Every structure is written in structure tokens, then in C-alpha cells.
Amino acid sequence: MTNYIKRFSILFFIVSSGLFANEGENLKDDIKNEESKDKEVFIEELVEDYEEIPGFFITYRDPKTNKIFLKINQNQLGKEFIYFAHVLDSVVTTGNVRGSYADKGIFKIEKDFENLRFTRVLTNYVFDEESPLKRSKGANTSDSTFKVIPIKGKNKEKNNFLIDITSLLLSESLTPILPIFSPEDFSPSRFAWGQVSPTKSRVLDVHNYEENTDFEVEYVIESAPSYEYDGEDAADPRNVSVHMRYSFIDMPNNDFEPRIENQSIGYFSDRITNLTSKEITPYEDLISKWHLKKQDPEAKFSKPVKPIVFWIENTTPLELRDYIKEGVLAWNIAFKEAGFIDAIEVKIQPDDAEWDAGDIRYNVLRWTSSPDPLFGGYGPRLSNPRTGEILGADIMLEWVYLTNRINYDSIFNAESSPASCHSSNLIQDGIILAENIQLNDPKIIEQSIKRLALHEVGHTLGLNHNFKGSYLHNNEDVHNPDITSKVGVTASVMEYPAINLAPLGVEQGDYYDTTPGPYDIWAIKYGYTPNLTASDLDEIIAEQNRPEHMFANDSEDMRSPGRGVDPRAMINDLTNDPITYAAQRIELINYNQANVVSKLSGNVKTFEEYRLALSIFMREYSRSLEVVSRHIGGVYVERYDPKNLNDKMPYSPAPPEEQRRAMGILHKHAFSTEAFPVNPDLLMRAQVERRMFDLYGEHEDPQIHKTILSIQNRVLDHVLSPWTLYRISDTELYGNDYSVNEVMNDLTKSIFTGDKDNKVSSIRRNLQTAYVRRLIDILGQDYYDELATAAAYNSLREIQKIVRRSSSDVSTKSHRKLVSWIIESGLDRAN
């Protein structure tokens, strides 16, 4: 019994000791928690050693680690802000170049327990406020949360939150930095970019203003060693920097008047669909435009309360500043039609200015000189996705496009992205062409600079390209400066026209537009006239049927073979008879090519000037042929409101007689024995200037056969495109009588007949072989229809008869045997 009592006592002691011990530990924890509450570190203490940068979002920088912190106020939670990213600097191969706009959107910050969530808001859809369907808002759509950041500290009132945004800024959470290529763009020889380095990348600066907070960031892309990077714009391609500037902007709260886009007028717009509308086209896309208000709302014409101010950057060459200023201010002609006097002002950035062009509060015309720029002019704008209000704009201009420096690789690569603006590229080509036909006219530079400024400022006003603007004049009026100086060379400075060179025997007129055209004035009137009623807008839109108001943008143009349908929506053309204009341009080129050696003799400093002359002549020749070719299989497109009377249908075939006339020009200047007259004196002088070992692995001689065949192939790429041939067959059902069979018969006759003395020239031998291979391909490809296949088969049989003809010329005999073999073996494979 005694032992039992002892054991129980010991057990009781142990248990009770443990209980008392646990109670003691809990007591200690409670004391610690109380002390912890008393010692809670608030924002004021956390940032006491940091640099404070006051402004829209109060920002702090840790001077020891360069970490960046934001203080978010309770009132800023759930509110929408505008996000904007643009490139301060990089190398061309990254796809990010100085001044280019990278990204924009709406974002909001929300508190989620002890984290703040950054979410990009979808703005593509709206609902009528009174509709019950509005309750379904957000169904089957998604906002995008791009970052979740822990709260580092709070103030005593718990309504301010401190977060470390360094990882947000140094990652690709905000905007992709690395180039993104589509599968079609993949090439084994393309430089393989690595990843953004989190250790080498850094925040360069913070700029804080009353309505926006900006961050400058340098991203360093680390890549593996590679031979594929052959540019000279990076000291070491293993470590390439991309400098970005991000802006967090307060959502404007003003009386801005949004305007819905009309398909007949080319504005950039923010895409919005009304999900409660019963319309077949429930689109409410909002055009991009500036917030202009009249000082006197009752006056017909009034100065604006706040004009649009453009600053000419202090990097701009002095000799160009007046031309640029005049070009920009010329837009006031159009704004007067909208009721505004001096809507645009131009100022010069002082050399000692404390602000820089990266500050979105300033709209700047900037000049740079880059080694290999993507474009020569670029006019991006930042707009509010909720309203379309333009908040800022810059214009990037490249010095290279006013020089004779030219990228030879691009001579016969005319493919381009609609996202890019190549107006200045064409202006550069025009200047060089004019120089090589010895037009020593100072008016060329003056008018080209004014037009470049007009074009790029047009983009910053919200206008996109208009590739039907070239149809304003006939072939006589376009060379009459009494007419063109008043209304322009084209209907729109947003065109990509050919330089207006007078044909042989005609006195030279204006080279380029120096004033907004009638389309531009109409577009500004629609977009900027304040306080318009629905009937007022309808009245303006009703002018869409005027020929000077024709419009087509980049999605409709025919610059690339097989793309687009309306031959009037084309680049490098001019006048309402572009076929004749192009033929006259080719005759002008042929004349000057024959005489260029004697003209340049004694004035050249390097034989590369002859090379440049040859290249620009051949490029202009190619462009003229492409303009002509687009009329074959063309369909005229008219876009108008059905309630506005119009005697034209939305779709009508290009007149068959115009298509046949175009084929006749192609026969003469692309395929016949007369095409491509070669100047041997020019070829012998067209030498590339050697630079160190750059000629290693290159064929430096002017490969004229290859060049000519590439031009001919670009014409055939279009005429024999499956889309062109489909369209020819389809339009036979509604007015076209120029059939696929007739088109191919005309091509075959042009390419295979007419050789002098039954001797086929080397240029024509190349062409004939390439053409036959194309016809064989048509037989073997599923994407050609049976109508095209039958026409191709018939042409091959006709060619077989032609090549059986005897010839005393050895080269012709060999060539015809080859062609015969290609046809026989090709037909065997196609069976």
C-alpha cells in the first residue's frame, strides 16, 4: 500500500509539474505577444533610413540595397489606374528600340489578407447600365492577376500599406521583355535569347509627379555564346540591356467627350463590344483623340482651353527645325474645320531643360541616329482604354533616313508589319532616287521633312494609315503645283505614296504633300468637332461617298503578294491612274539608268555610289511593277453606311479592261525581251566598298540575273497566288470576264514568245524556267482550285509545243531541253 501511495504521489507530481510548466509557457507566450504588439514596427520606422520620393504613389528607395517600396493608401485600393510601358533604349534585335511603346492597360490593387494583389482589368466589354444583363458582367471572361506582394508594414491607423515592388519591376510581370516570335518566324539561324538576369537587372530611377509615378529599369538579358548574333550594336551579345520606363497613371476625371469609331474613317481605337446590344455589329470602339475644349463654347471658331503642345527635342538638327515646325503646325488647317484655332502649338526644348523626352507629360518630336533602325519615323500615342483620350505622344525620327546610308538586305524584302510605320523609309528612297536622276532641288528636302512631320504627327492625333489617299489627282494635275500646293499631292498625308517625280518631258511639280489633304481634314472634323449630336455625326459620315474621302488601312493594303483585294489600297503608287503613272516611272528609270554613269562621273567619292544608284533604280522598278500587278484579279471595296445613297456596290471587280491593260504593262516591262534594259557601264562600276573582312563568304559582284529574277518572281507571286486566282474565278460570277485561263494564257504568251531570232536571252531563260516550275507546283498543291489547275495544265501543254521549236543558239537549245524535261517529269509526278 505504501509503495502504491509513493508511486501515485510521484506520478501526480510529474503530471502536475508538466501542467504547471505548460501554464507557465503559455503565460510567457501571452507576455511575448503583448510585448510584440507594443513593439509593432510601423511604416514610419521601416522607412526612416530610406529616401522618400513624394508624388502620386509615395515611393521609397533603400539607399543600401536599391530596393523600391510603394506606400499604398486605403483609398487607392480597388481603384483603376492606367499602366503604360515604353522603351528608353535597347538594340534592334530585341524588338525594343528607343521610343517604342511596349504596353498599356488598366490595373487595380486589392488587399487580400496580408498581401496586395496587382490585377490587369479587361476593358473590352460593356453593358447598358439599365439592362438586367449587366448583373452577368464578368461571365466567361477573366481579369489577370500579374503579381501578389506581401505587406511589409502598416501605419498606426492601418490604412496605409508598405510593399516591396522590386521583384515586380525586375521581372517580366508587368510586360514581356524578351522577344516573342511566332512559329512562322522561327529560323534555326535566329539568335536564341536567354533570360532576364535578376541579379544584373536594376532599377535606375524613380520619377514622381502629381498624377503619375514612373520607374526606369534596366533589364539585362543573359544569353549563351552564339555565332548567330552578327550585329555591331552590342558590346557582348551574351549580356544585352533593355531600358524601360513604366508609368502608373491616375485615371483622368474630366468631361472628355468619347467618340465611337466609324469604319469609313481611320482612327486608332480601343476595342469595345456591347454585350447587351441586339445589333449585328455591337461595336462601340472608342477612337483615340486628344481632350480639346473651346475657350468660348458658343463661338464657331475658338482657341482651345489647353492646346496640344509638341516639343522639338534639342537633339534635332538646327537646319531641320523650321521645316518640322511648319509641318506640325500645318495640322491647324484641319483643326479649323473642327472649330479650333491654333489647336496645336510647337516649342523647342531648351538645351538646359531639366526634363527629358521620357517624361510622358511632354509630347516630343525626337531625333536619334542608330546603326540599324527598324523605322525612320514612328508616332505612337498613349490613350485611356476606358475613353480613348490620348494622354501623351512622342515621335521618333531617325537621322539615317535623310542620308544615303541604306540597308541593301531590305531592297527586295517589302514585307512589313502593320504595327510599324515606314513612311520615312519611302521618303529616304525618294530622296536618293531624286539625287540619282540629278534633281538638285532643295525643295525635295524641305517638302520631305514637312511631310514626314505631318505623317507622324497624324498618328499622334489618332489617325492610322490611309492607303487610298493616292487616288486624289489625275496624271496631269498631280504635276501642277498650283493645284497640289493647295490641296496636297494626295488626299491624305497618312498615305505611303511614291515620290512625285515628273515623267519624261513634263515639268517637275511638288514632290510631297506639305498640307493635310481633304481626307485628313474630314477625319479631324469627325473626331474633334465638339458637342456633336447623332444627326451631326451622320451628316459628317455621309461625306464618305466622296472620292477624295476613300479610305483603307494596313489590314486592307496589297503591298504583300496575295494579300488584300483592292488595288487602290496600295503603297508606292500615285494618281487615279496608277498603271500609267507606274509605267511612266519605269520609263524614267530606264532613261536615267542609261545615263547615270555620265551624270555621276567626276562627282563620286566611292564606287559604292554607283552600287546605291543601281539598287535604288531596281527597287523603284520593282515597286512600279508590283503596283501594276495588283490590278489583275482586283476587287474594288467600298465601305459606307447603306442609308447613304451610293451607286457603287461594296464589292465590284476591277474593270476587266484595266486588268488587261495591267497585263500589257507587265508584258512590256517585266517579261518581254524589252524588259530590264541593262547598262553594262553601271554594272562594272557598282562595287561594294570593302570594310575589313566583311566580304568574307560574300559574293560582292552585282548579281543582276538574281536581282531581276527576284523582281519577276515577286510579280508572279501575286498574279499566281491561289488567293488571286480564287478571286478571278469568283468575280466571274459578278462582272469580271478576265478569266483564269485568259490570265495564264497571257502570261505564257508574254514569257515564252517574242524572242528575237529564236534566241532566248539569259534573263528570259531564268524567267521561263521559274515560270514552268510554278505551273508544275500548281498541279501538285491542294490549295489551288480545279480551275487554276486546269489553266496551269493547259499552259504547260502549250509551252511543250513552243520549246520543241529548233534554234541554232546552243544556250537556247540546252534551255529548251531542260524546260521540256521539267514539264515531262513534273506531269509524271502530278499524276
PLM regions with names:
Residues 1-9:
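Bacterial N-terminal signal peptides that target proteins for export
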Residues 25-316, 334, 338, 349-440, ...:
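Auxiliary tRNA-acceptor-end handling modules of aminoacyl-tRNA synthetases
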Residues 444, 470-831:
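Conserved catalytic/binding loops enriched for acidic/polar residues
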Residues 348-370, 374, 447-503:
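The catalytic-center signature of Zn2+-dependent metalloproteases
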Residues 329-340, 458-459, 463, 499, ...:
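Sec-exported extracytoplasmic/periplasmic mature domains
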Residues 70, 331, 388, 455, ...:
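Divalent metal-coordination and catalytic microenvironments
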Residues 389-407, 453, 457-458, 503-504, ...:
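Extended catalytic-interface subdomain
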Residues 12-21:
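Hydrophobic h-region of N-terminal signal peptides that target proteins for export
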